[in-house]
């Protein structure tokens, strides 16, 4: 399971069952709010993607 971390508020958001859904929502939220969001793997704590103002700036392999 994956969650979205909001850099502005320091809070985690909704839990998503698929990485694709989490990345899509992080992209949308980042674009809409013009801020940074991370997609976090809830089991390992690994950052899977980072978005900055709607652009994906990092993507983990896998």
What feature does the model see in each segment?
Residues 1-13, 21, 38-41, 53, ...:
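Short aromatic-glycine-(Arg/Gly/Cys) micro-motifs in beta-strand/loop hairpins
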Residues 17-27:
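Charged, amphipathic alpha-helical segments
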Residues 29-62:
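Short, mixed-charge low-complexity intrinsically disordered segments
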């Amino acid at each position: 399971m994956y969650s979205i971390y909001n850099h502005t508020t320091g809070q985690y958001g909704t839990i998503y069952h698929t990485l694709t859904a989490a990345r899509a929502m992080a992209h949308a939220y980042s674009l809409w709010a013009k801020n940074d969001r991370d997609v976090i793997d809830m089991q390992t704590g690994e950052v899977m993607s980072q978005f900055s103002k709607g652009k994906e700036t990092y993507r983990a392999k896998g």
